[in-house]
Amino acid sequence: IGLYLLSILTARDLGYIGTLEAVKRIGNTIGTMLRLEQWKGHYYNWYHTQTLEPLRPLYVSTVDNGNLIGYLITLSQGMEELFKRPLIGKENIAGLRDVLSLNSGEEDMEHQSLLNTLMDSETVSVSEWLMLLDDLKGQSKAVDQLITEYETEEELFFPWSRLLQKIPATLLSEKGVYQETSRKMSELLKQLNGPISLQNIYDNYLGILKSLSETMVSLNRDACQSSGFRESGKWLKDMEISLAGSYSAIRDFASRCHRLRSEIKDIIDKMD
């Protein structure tokens, strides 16, 4: 059980599954462990995989349970790290590259070259990541399955990410009435279009909203009579709504991870 739990973290580290899928699998396993019969907090060596009843002869190995404690401590620390690390990293690109290489029907030099280029870059922006996922769709069933996982967590945790692909040109213009608004917009994008973690959004939500609000104020003050005002205003309002959804989803996920880590600690503490 302990090795399986750590293999889930390893799969996430290698980019073969996403953060959401990793926590789901860990939660399912811990939930099953809590249902298993124990002896003074220790697990028996054998259980029926269907009924979960301990198999005879009943046997408790202090060595195996001791190893399990070590695995669970590592697991808990790894789960904390999942929340702090960027949701999109080079390991995700490496995982996609491996899956593409193993499942492509023919040598896919174009996509492999794109993946290698992103691997060599210093960071991967949210926009680059979304364009990559769109570009790789349809290559194979396995690739599409992994892309679906990544898109699911992107839509849950960063629902504003797709808005970054359709920013009104006027919000990025450095000329005329949009000059100050563009400067505020750049400050907002620096906080969103980079290697950001769930912890980053959770901790800096109010600061991000402040940057968004300043952009709105600048737009309303300086460009309310311009031709692109309505489109730009709608985009900013959509971003505000999406950020609220992002914060809510991340907060719920943080609570879920906290409960899981508490359950893991309880399992450890019960082993005398």
Spans of features found by a protein language model:
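Acidic, mature catalytic/reactive cores of soluble proteins
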Residues: 1-272
